Amino acid sequence: WDLAQDFASIAPYTIEEAYEVADAIEKNDLNHLRDELGDLLLQVVFHAQMASEQDAFDFNAVADAISDKMIKRHPHIFDTSQYRNAKTQTIAWEEQKAIERAELAAKESRAVSALDGVASALPALTRALKLQKRAARIGFDWPDAAPVMDKIREETAELQVEMDAGNGPGMVDELGDLLFSVVNLARHLDIDPEAALRAGNAKFERRFRHLEADLADQGLDPKDLDITALEAAWKNSKTHDNSTD
């Protein structure tokens, strides 16, 4: 199996392992975190080995590259004589990243953009947040959360128009705008949208599992109930969940 893999086929597993690391951290399970970090490290070793077999680079080169990058980006640690406070450290960090982006743009014969370096493979919510933060650095931003809420209402109304028209592509477009605006609201509220959605997922899962267990205790199968009965069971589950918070 290993011999049949390439970078693209392994990439989904690498992403999955990174999420499992995050899951262990959120659960504050250090034993699990140790195991998941090992699994993630194996992914790094696997990719490095495949690259080595193509005479591209090896694991040592990966370690050397990140070491060099950390030294360049953290002069306040490795050259403390120049950086006396957090503000100058942050400025130096941003200047170094700007230099790296400019070098990459020149290498690729294109103009430098404030959005350079935001990976396209990031989860959509995370990428939206990063794009918005980059745009905000050059002043392209709302002053506070209030106009963002107005924008959400506007996008919701535009989505409704497309829904009423039965316009599939239009619904996709407007729903994307709405989600992007919701991420923007999260940013203005200083909330990580990925963390907020994970918490929402966990709450739904917790309440739905309680719904299933409660119905099972009554000898009922959710599949046999209509939506009215399921809504009533859901409300009971929410009440139970809120009482245990």
Descriptions of predicted regions:
Residues W1-E36, L42-L175, L179-D245:
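Flexible "arm" and connector segments at domain edges
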